[in-house]
Amino acid sequence: MARKPGLAPKKVPLQKLNKTNPNFSNRQKQIQRSKQEDEHRKKLEEIPEDNTSHMFFSYNEALVPPYHVIIDTNFINFSISHKLDIIHSLMDCLYAKCIPYISDCVAAEIERLGSKFKVALKISKDPRFQRLTCSHKGTYADDCIINRITMHRMFIVATCDADLRRRIRKIPGVPIVYLKGKKYTVERMPDLLQ
């Protein structure tokens, strides 16, 4: 659409943004928050992952009997549904004594599942299972397990969660126990016969 000659566009009065205007302070706060979030994201991206490449073709020498096994929520649930005793089945699978560990995040996740999973809650409170206290905020169990095994590579992770297993495979030297058929299977543990 062509403009008629001689007509000037309407001027819309702009609000003055100064320190007395409430929109100014809100806008400044939004800008400050976005800058802080960007800085936080950059810091997270800059943190190098400590993937030890010397462990790529060998196994983790910190894994010695008795094995320390971190157990995930769905591993407990699948073991119950297949009527497997967790501790005895782990010992049969790994051919050695095992010490099962449950983090506070996993226990909180089981409690949140409700009355349908009373048996899983009872198993998680078994005195044979060691409790790992969590110092972080939030109760997302997968992140808790990933953080713990990246810090200390002395654990074997027992999970049936495909996404968690995919994330663990990126960390060298951490074996995974999962349910295959009606028995436990170990992945990335070279000294065991599969």
UniProtKB/Swiss-Prot annotation:
SMART domains associated with the record: PINc (SM00670)
Cellular compartments per GO CC: nucleolus; small-subunit processome
Renumbered residue ranges of the record's region Disordered: 1-41
Residue intervals passing through the bilayer: none
InterPro entries: Fcf1/Utp23, Fcf1_PIN, PIN-like_dom_sf, PIN_dom
Keywords tagged on the record: Nucleus, Ribosome biogenesis, rRNA processing
One example of a Gene Ontology biological process annotation: rRNA processing
Similarity comment text for this entry: Belongs to the UTP23/FCF1 family. FCF1 subfamily.
The protein's role, per its UniProt record: Part of the small subunit (SSU) processome, first precursor of the small eukaryotic ribosomal subunit. During the assembly of the SSU processome in the nucleolus, many ribosome biogenesis factors, an RNA chaperone and ribosomal proteins associate with the nascent pre-rRNA and work in concert to generate RNA folding, modifications, rearrangements and cleavage as well as targeted degradation of pre-ribosomal RNA by the RNA exosome.
Protein name: rRNA-processing protein FCF1 homolog
Organism in which the protein naturally occurs: Dictyostelium discoideum (Social amoeba)
Gene name linked to the record: fcf1
